[in-house]
Amino acid sequence: MMEEELLIPEDEYQKSGIHIGTQIKSKDMDPYIFKIRNDGLYILDIRKTNHALIIAGKMLARYRPEQILAVAQRQYAFRPVSKFSEVVGSKSIIGRFIPGTLTNPALPNYSEAKIILVTDPLADTQAMKEAIKVGIPIIAMCDANNKTDFVDLIIPTNNKGRRSLAVIYWLLAREILKNRGDIKSYDEFKQTIDDFEVQI
């Protein structure tokens, strides 16, 4: 089997800390662990992250932009998610996910999303519960400690880091536009990773 080409050089992935997991590992995430460091941190497999991003890009490109809902409760994900939504034209909810958003058509903020992109299954539990209830596919950024029940596509990544979240959402936006045919090559993607990163 040929090795899949990386979307960005391996050292760029490493610099962003995308592969730095947690000191606690769930059984669900076993297949995505590359190694355990001397300090007890689980390291995620960059090639599996890369592969998941390629699959997610193809999958999300099949949906109309307004059918995609990206959610984030984590503060470091606010900027990446809002920028991602702006670039790909999707809907987004940052901060508190109001109960009933996916299940109660009477709510003014009701969403008829056909697929949901979750930044952290642990933090975004309300969004997860509702997506499961209405039966829409779930793509989730999963760290070493996450449980992955009901997740249709796992993107193994550091879902807590400022830079790692920026890189993940930047790459995903670029993949979606390329798969849609909105850009013919990566050179045409003018946004930078910095555009997606929360500034402190």
Swiss-Prot record:
Family matches, as Gene3D superfamilies: Glucose-6-phosphate isomerase like protein, domain 1 (3.40.50.10490)
Signal peptide (residue range): none
Transmembrane regions: none
Keywords: Ribonucleoprotein, Ribosomal protein
Keyword Ribonucleoprotein: yes
Pfam families: Ribosomal_S2
Annotated Gene Ontology cellular component terms: small ribosomal subunit
BP GO terms, sorted: translation
Key word Iron present: no
GO terms for MF: structural constituent of ribosome
Similarity field: Belongs to the universal ribosomal protein uS2 family.
NCBIfam families: uS2_euk_arch (TIGR01012)
Protein name: Small ribosomal subunit protein uS2
Organism, as annotated: Picrophilus torridus (strain ATCC 700027 / DSM 9790 / JCM 10055 / NBRC 100828 / KAW 2/3)
